[in-house]
Amino acid sequence: MSATLALTEQLIARASVTPDDQHCQQLMIERLAALGFECETIASHGVTNFWAVKRGTAGRAGKLLAFAGHTDVVPTGPLEQWSSPPFVPTHRDGKLYGRGAADMKTSLAGFVVAAEEFVAAHPQHRGSIGFLITSDEEGPATDGTVKVVEALAARGERLDYCIVGEPTSTATLGDVVKNGRRGSMSGELVVKGVQGHIAYPHLAKNPIHLLAPALAELAAEQWDEGNEYFPPTTWQVSNLRAGTGATNVIPGHADLLFNFRFSTASTVEGLQARVHAILDRHGLDYTLNWSVSGLPFLTPRGELSNALDAAIRAETGVSPELSTTGGTSDGRFIARICPQVIEFGPPNASIHKIDEHIDVRFVDPLKNVYRRVLEQLIA
């Protein structure tokens, strides 16, 4: 069994349901400390994080390439629906089954073994290697990567390159890498009316009727046209609530939850202003609370994307596509202190599902891609 596969199995066997790390990080830290990494645990409100760095011969003058990822996994769902216990790594039909196999314990194992092989082959490597690992990516993500980034920023630590081990591939290993993600912003809108008897609408004010024209305009709005890297910004309603459940009462208020997924072609302030303008134009009496869970980030083609492209082609023969689709990731936090952030990992078809798995034949090539990038950028 390869070193990467063995470590993947060890990590899967630890039931690290968010935010409980179950000592996965300690397992990684022990391996990294043996290589000469300086390892620092940064805990916050029950969340376990660590930052580890091994300086190259150039010290802080050299480039720093960091691997970032998460040890936490989502809950298993109904255990009886799994073909094998989710925290017992199981081989079947050329695949390794277990919660976290694809998202993202194989990537974590690949990071560690790639670093071990690289340091053994290049003991005098010029650049530096970092690890930024959290147990709060699948949860609220309020005490995880963002806390490590804040700590690093406070001490003036800057990363030059960062690979996030998210499962970005689709049909086969290496076909898709993510060089950015859209931002996410939600709004909680309450439109006020006047409650009354449904037979006497002239004595009441129906907030649903008042909201409907504005809602139609918001849904039809073209927020931007996107750009070379991002599709157009989208606005979607996630929840709409009003009424008491009775058939003869006009409700006193209507509550709407909505979400923007927005590109670098728009700004938080610009989108908020346009929403308020539409609501005001319809004369609504309302309150609106905003929540921004992530800003968009983008890494244009450059040293990191070129190195990753070359490594994937050499290892798999696949020509990767740069993409910014999907939800948010911890890359949005890391981009604050790193100009080049790219996500790359195994196929994602089974993530968060019953019987999550990874094709075993992708395990070592994934590690090899990570090692090749180290060799190209910091050897």
UniProtKB/Swiss-Prot annotation:
Listed CDD domains: M20_DapE_proteobac (cd03891)
Residue positions binding Zn(2+) 1: 70, 103, 166
Catalytic activity as recorded in UniProt: N-succinyl-(2S,6S)-2,6-diaminopimelate + H2O = (2S,6S)-2,6-diaminopimelate + succinate
Active-site feature positions: 72, 137
Residues binding Zn(2+) 2: 103, 138, 352
Cofactor(s) for this UniProt protein: Zn(2+); Co(2+)
Cofactor binding description: Binds 2 Zn(2+) or Co(2+) ions per subunit.
Function description: Catalyzes the hydrolysis of N-succinyl-L,L-diaminopimelic acid (SDAP), forming succinate and LL-2,6-diaminopimelate (DAP), an intermediate involved in the bacterial biosynthesis of lysine and meso-diaminopimelic acid, an essential component of bacterial cell walls.
Keywords, comma-separated and alphabetical: Amino-acid biosynthesis, Cobalt, Diaminopimelate biosynthesis, Hydrolase, Lysine biosynthesis, Metal-binding, Zinc
HAMAP family: DapE
GO terms of biological process kind: diaminopimelate biosynthetic process; L-arginine biosynthetic process; lysine biosynthetic process via diaminopimelate
SUPFAM superfamilies: Bacterial exopeptidase dimerisation domain (SSF55031), Zn-dependent exopeptidases (SSF53187)
Organism of origin: Burkholderia pseudomallei (strain K96243)
Domain of life of the source: Bacteria
Transmembrane segments: none
Molecular function, one GO term: acetylornithine deacetylase activity
EC primary class: hydrolase
Family per similarity comment: Belongs to the peptidase M20A family. DapE subfamily.
Listed EC numbers: 3.5.1.18
Pathway annotation from the record: Amino-acid biosynthesis; L-lysine biosynthesis via DAP pathway; LL-2,6-diaminopimelate from (S)-tetrahydrodipicolinate (succinylase route): step 3/3
Oligomer status and interactors: Homodimer.
Name by which UniProt lists this protein: Succinyl-diaminopimelate desuccinylase
